[in-house]
């Protein structure tokens, strides 16, 4: 029985020569005519893309249609028949679009296609978009709005994937992030710092209006404030770092340094192998899954991987959110975990107290803040609390001012056991959570909260997952892992594909 499938095109290696000659001629002409370098660069790039499209088309032609005979026996013993009609598919590469015709194998037309030799040999992706184009497109999408990506790719490659395609691509890519993360080996012990630092914080992400809600309801300010148009993502980070011993005076000097003063030039330890993760609450089997539980579950796993001998102090540095501290107490090791209140969440409250007590007297207020912060750094939190209460009584604060001061003192009192800053500084521990603050801003806000952006839980979680692989420095490894897993899933008979020989060896040669 004759093959009904036809090759992609009847091209041969020699057909690349005219394009190569055109490129050479263009460069020579540009040199003779004194063409500006940037104009020549654009002309060369245009011809390189043409050459790439032609070369990739040649690859498809040399592979042929994937016709390996009327009947193929699969490794499981099943015999499949070549179907009468060839089947088309689209392959959108960085060089442009291809429409491919392939021989396919199965039991009969209309039934499931079991084996496609052409796809198997070339390990094509499930979607129309090449793995390389997916890589490049998503590397743009994780940093800029989806609508900007087609513009960027169009300017560079003359390829314009739709926004819907990019969103689906991101959702599909995100499916592999969790298994990839779990497969990563722990850093080598000699590459780690002596301290294991853990931190978490929340950041709101704007959600799309529910489908059942009328557009006018979005203008109901009271209802909007009750339903909360944002969902809170809980961001977590783990890293190791070496100690940096400091005195309270050194810290307070850095906090009150004039903007014109240069910071101390001494080298500071650098966080090692910083890992970020973020989770949103979602429903699973009809039950609400907590974002805090998800994030702290991962933090606990990461700490166990990074501190397997439990020989590093685990420093949990956060703000005063009660639910986060409770999660840390539940999920992190009971032994060796030290809770530290981020100093920079205490200092604003000292400022608030100064304003309550001294009003607009900035000089006196600054003096009070300096004194109280220094005393906090010396471990005198109880004395600071007592002093603030005493001053509130002396100044006869009433009403809202009295209540506000009580809140400030209550916050400090509730976190006093996390404010032994004199001990932390002497041990070289960090006392501020700048890493997680920066993560919430860069990881979440810079991508998820741009003007007009609205997300679903699914789309937001997918973006956070894929974005985390880049921020963790794992992008290339993730892409390789994903392609390998997709190949295993899509092509269980790939060993057969590696032995396909639809052309004579002489035809496959690229020699002239």
Can you annotate each of these PLM segments?
Residues 62-126:
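An N-terminal low-complexity regulatory-tail signal and nearby short nucleic-acid-interaction modules
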Residues 1-61, 104-512:
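Catalytic center-proximal scaffold of phosphoryl-transfer enzymes
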